[in-house]
Regions:
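Active-site-proximal polar cores
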Residues: 140
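Extracellular/periplasmic, surface-exposed regions of secreted and cell-surface proteins
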Residues: 19-38, 42-48, 53-57, 73-135, ...
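Conserved functional hotspot residues at active sites or interaction interfaces
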Residues: 62
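Amphipathic helix-loop-helix modules that constitute alpha-helical solenoid scaffolds
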Residues: 67-69
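Surface-exposed beta-strand-turn/loop segments characteristic
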Residues: 1-10
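Short, conserved loop/turn and helix-capping segments at secondary-structure boundaries
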Residues: 10-14, 256-259
Length: 389
């Protein structure tokens, strides 16, 4: 251990959470959810990867932890794991996460129609991470023998000044989400069960310490989703879903995509005439679905793939000279090149999915499920690696 600073591994976390529901009226509920998490982590500055690597590669008997007079031991090309753990400084990371949601739910059963509700919700999440790395490169030695008086003689391995350096990093995110939905669920004549939902959502994610000018732009998306279901005596099932989603990653005219899906099911084991065999086969259901989903995260680390990016510091061809203070008095000027070619026609990557399946329950104890599915993807965005001749 080092008496100048604390490099020991430690982790502390503090949590706070509260959920409050307030009945504003008999049919109106205001909900507030707030949670906070604060963590502090301390560790050696060298990092776990370096420590484990050197521990596995160094011969245990090559050098001691320290020499008897307290001198730090090491050998050329292979740092002493003891020094990495105790003598290279420390890293301290503190982070906090705050999450909050406010919602308002209204039940319209008494004055519009039974089973109709609406809900709006707003949430704000914030994260902050601050890291302090205080590193030091100590002087290390290797014993090469003893003098006539029995004192250890050393050769210098690392002749560093031993000063502590400071390196800091900061990161954080801000996430805003708004949702508004209308829901309807009702059963008629003990046989017909219907439900419907329409949901609008809008999201925005921003970084407090963006690493590039592209990352400084908030990540935004919005969309509308809808679902309708129907079942008859819990035997016949039908469901329709759709999403109409918008993404910032595409050019105007291509930002929104429509993705529908439909599913049907038949619970044959709920038929009255199935009762004689229900002790053996208690569940038998056939189901099928067909629909599409979209993916807008198609550019990897690249955003706004519809825009062409320009490099103003291209090397290679010289396009002129300008005066400078060198001996020649001039320096060449590079040109402008295209870094990434934009594609204004790029749009949602779409996956068309189809599925048929069966669910089987035996003896009220064993359930078997089998599915056959097909997934076909279209509109996959690829970067051309070479230009055809």
């Amino acid at each position: 251990a080092n008496d100048r600073y604390d490099a020991q591994m430690s982790y502390q976390r503090f949590n706070f959470r509260t959920n409050v529901d307030i009945n504003l009226t008999k049919s109106t509920v205001l909900g507030m959810n707030v949670s906070t998490q604060f963590t502090v982590k301390n560790s050696p500055a060298a990092g776990l990867d370096a420590l484990l690597t050197q521990t596995m590669t160094m011969t245990p008997t090559a050098i001691p932890l320290k020499y008897t007079d307290g001198t730090l031991a090491s050998i050329k090309g292979t740092p002493n794991p003891y020094n990495l753990l105790n003598e290279r400084g420390y890293s301290n990371t503190s982070s906090n996460v705050a999450q909050s949601t406010v919602s308002l739910t209204q039940d319209f059963s008494d004055f519009v129609t039974e089973g109709l509700t609406a809900r709006v919700a707003f949430s704000f999440d914030a994260t902050n991470v601050n890291t302090l790395n205080r590193s030091i490169l100590p002087k290390t030695y290797r014993a090469i023998g003893r003098d006539d008086d029995g004192n250890i003689q050393y050769e210098v391995i690392d002749d560093y000044a031993g000063y502590i350096t400071l390196d800091t990093s900061h990161s954080g995110t801000r996430y805003i989400n708004f949702e508004g939905s209308v829901n309807y669920e009702r059963q008629f004549a003990y046989a017909h069960r219907v439900s419907a939902m329409v949901l609008y959502s809008m999201r925005s994610l921003s970084h407090t310490h963006p690493g590039s000018y592209i990352a400084a732009f908030p990540y935004k998306s919005m969309g509308v989703a809808a679902r309708a279901t129907y079942s008859y005596k819990d035997r016949y099932f039908f469901e329709f879903n759709m999403g109409y989603n918008g993404s910032e990653n595409f050019a105007p005219g291509h930002r929104f995509g429509f993705f529908p899906a439909v599913a049907v099911g038949y619970m044959i084991s709920n038929e009255p005439w199935w009762e004689p065999v229900s002790d053996v086969i208690n569940l038998l259901k056939f189901k099928a679905s067909y629909g599409s989903v979209g993916n807008d995260q198609i550019g990897g680390s690249r955003r706004f793939a519809y825009n062409t990016t320009i490099n103003t510091s291209a090397t290679g061809a010289a396009w002129g000279t300008v005066p400078n203070s060198s001996a020649t008095g001039y320096q060449t000027v590079g040109g402008i090149t295209t870094s990434e070619m934009g594609n204004s026609e790029v749009e949602w990557e779409q996956a068309t999915k189809s599925n048929v399946g069966i669910e089987l329950g035996l003896f009220n104890d064993l359930t078997i499920q089998a599915d056959l599915f097909r997934d076909y993807r279209d509109g996959i965005f690829l970067m051309r690696q070479s230009t055809p001749s």
